[in-house]
Amino acid sequence: MADLITVARPYAEALYGLAKESGQEQAWADALQALAAMIADVQAQAFLTDPERADAEKVSLLSAVPVAVDVKAWKAFLALLIHNDRWPATAEIGTLFADAMRRAEGVVDVLVTSAIALDAGQKTAVQSALERRFAGHKVAFREAVDAALIGGLVIHTGDLTIDASVRGQVQQLARTLRS
């Protein structure tokens, strides 16, 4: 199966559009979170992967998730997930949906990974650079440390990854030399 984020994106975008239209963004986010929790269960996964089970049975199982959204739209979404065998991407759909909600609120979530922990001055500099890069948006900054980067930073937000690490530069050089 294709990368789950890639598979999830059109579903998340369509659901977000529907939710926004009806003013039920949070209710849909909650429903997706509950659905992802159910699908994470080993027994539910066994049921959903059982080739002897009809799609209607699988939709019925997933319909047991209590939701505060339009039931007809919810069941249509579940039927689509089952029919297209996209239920494994449910957690990613929920994540992308939540990302869309935050973007609509003007917030960009950014993960900054560095080889060593950033000091206060470095954090301020990175935060300022990110706010310039994402002008008009509030930047929610998270930090991680990965010594394998050797030095520099990797900045990740949504589909955008900026690899300014020593490891990334070495890998790029190796690819260039091989070609």
UniProtKB/Swiss-Prot annotation:
GO molecular function, one term: proton-transporting ATP synthase activity, rotational mechanism
Keywords of the record: ATP synthesis, Cell inner membrane, Cell membrane, CF(1), Hydrogen ion transport, Ion transport, Membrane, Transport
Annotated Pfam families: OSCP (PF00213)
InterPro entries assigned: ATP_synth_OSCP/delta_N_sf, ATPase_OSCP/d_CS, ATPase_OSCP/dsu
Gene Ontology CC terms: plasma membrane; proton-transporting ATP synthase complex
Membrane topology recorded in Swiss-Prot or TrEMBL: Peripheral membrane protein
Main localization, broad class: membrane
Subcellular location: Cell inner membrane
Subunit annotation: F-type ATPases have 2 components, F(1) - the catalytic core - and F(0) - the membrane proton channel. F(1) has five subunits: alpha(3), beta(3), gamma(1), delta(1), epsilon(1). F(0) has three main subunits: a(1), b(2) and c(10-14). The alpha and beta chains form an alternating ring which encloses part of the gamma chain. F(1) is attached to F(0) by a central stalk formed by the gamma and epsilon chains, while a peripheral stalk is formed by the delta and b chains.
Family membership noted in the UniProt record: Belongs to the ATPase delta chain family.
PANTHER family referenced in this protein's UniProt entry, alphabetically: ATP SYNTHASE DELTA CHAIN
Function comment: F(1)F(0) ATP synthase produces ATP from ADP in the presence of a proton or sodium gradient. F-type ATPases consist of two structural domains, F(1) containing the extramembraneous catalytic core and F(0) containing the membrane proton channel, linked together by a central stalk and a peripheral stalk. During catalysis, ATP synthesis in the catalytic domain of F(1) is coupled via a rotary mechanism of the central stalk subunits to proton translocation.
NCBIfam families linked: ATP_synt_delta (TIGR01145), PRK05758.2-2 (NF004402)
This protein's name: ATP synthase subunit delta
Species this protein is from: Acidithiobacillus ferrooxidans (strain ATCC 23270 / DSM 14882 / CIP 104768 / NCIMB 8455)
Gene: atpH
